[in-house]
Amino acid sequence: IARLKRLGKIRTSETYTAALRSFSGFMNDKEVLFDQLNADLIAEYEAYLKGRGNSPNTVSFYMRILKAVYNRAVEDGLTEQRHPFKSVYTGVEKTLKRAISLNDLKHIKGLDLSLKPNLDFARDMFLFCFYTRGMSFIDMAYLRKKDLQNGILSYRRRKTGQQLFIKWERCMQEIVDKYPINETEYLLPIITKRDEDYRKQYTNELHRVNHLLKKIGKQLDLPILLTMYVGRHSWASIAKSRNVPISVISEGMGHDSENTTQIYLASLDTSVVDKANKKILDLL
């Protein structure tokens, strides 16, 4: 975990910390040697996670992290490879639908929230995510003003390290123009205070925005809970429905990992992706 932090992989270090806490809770905070990790213990841990109501993907998530730590210990010569994870599930199941329709998006965009500035802000962040090909909230939070130059928004995905380029459209500028100029180096009003921890500001805003989006979703009687992540899925789903090539969007994010779609998007000629994005934005 300390190594991940040194490498700047803060989010990954946080997920490893969460997994460590989970396994420590299972072991009642007793220390466990790598040599003690065997198939029976791992099977018991899997049953423990399921017994606490975790979904198959959450159970698999913790197992994959624990397996990665174990394999690292094997590589470093700290233990022998005994394959303790051979009998537990470490794949990813397709989750429930996380996308909304084009009509739903139009309803969100057309909602009169002029007297509800907090909901209006959450709606703007959701739309900005959609406008920018499903940009994740953490990447939105850390967009710098200097990332926007000559009509092109360029940024590096914090999760994958992929460099992405997006043609700046009028709808994006309209959202930026609604809010006072940020006193920090960042473009959007998510991280706004120089004297407060930036990471904490991001996580607080993510929770607040998702809470507000759920209210908007209930107001419109949407079929699923509205969150920032729905914006990511919806762009890909709508793109697919409008015959944008699968090579551009990689199966509407119905893949085994979130990374795949962004890798596809980043590896293509950006003009192809920009045209695809413009095609989708023109529908609204």
Segments (PLM) and residue ranges:
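Active-site/catalytic core of tyrosine-dependent DNA strand-transfer enzymes
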Residues: L105, E169-P223
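Short, basic (Lys/Arg/His-rich) helix/loop patches that form interaction surfaces
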Residues: G110, S114-P117, N210-E251
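DNA/chromatin major-groove-contacting recognition/catalytic segments
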Residues: F165-R170, E174, K178-Y179, A266-L284
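N-terminal core-binding DNA-recognition domain of tyrosine recombinases/integrases
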Residues: A2-R11, L20-L96, L111-S114
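Catalytic-site neighborhood detector that most strongly recognizes the C-terminal catalytic loop/helix
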Residues: A99, R157-G161, M253-K278
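Short, polar N-cap/turn motifs at the start of nucleic acid-interacting alpha helices
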Residues: K146-S154, L222-I224, V244-I263
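Conserved tyrosine-mediated DNA breakage-rejoining catalytic core shared by Y-recombinases
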Residues: Y142-K178
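Basic, Lys/Arg- and aromatic-enriched nucleic-acid-binding interface segment
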Residues: H83-F137
